[in-house]
Amino acid sequence: MIYSTTETIPGREIAEIKGVVTGNVVQSKHIGRDLMAGLKSIVGGEIRGYTEMMTEARNIAIQRMVEDAANLGADAVVGIRFTTSSIVDGSSEILAFGTAVKLL
């Protein structure tokens, strides 16, 4: 499966639009990461535990979006975007979405 943030795939032509596809994950904080985050917020700097957690969550969201596209018979997903939001205190949602297409 090809997926891209661009609206087209270079060297390929879109034959059919299959529809909007999504993949999301809600990730909660880990108490150990929370303690380190509290310390980092005092002294400043990147909170690596959260960065790694969000990277993993984004990858899961992409995988779920690609599975959604495959279920529609798509060859690719174009125009991929990401959003994040807080669901409840201590958890965040990452949503990946794009347009599933069939290529020539």
From Swiss-Prot:
Superkingdom as given in the UniProt entry: Bacteria
Similarity section: Belongs to the UPF0145 family.
Pfam families listed in its UniProt record: YbjQ_1
PANTHER family found in the cross-reference section: UPF0145 PROTEIN SCO3412, UPF0145 PROTEIN YBJQ
Record's protein name: UPF0145 protein VIBHAR_02090
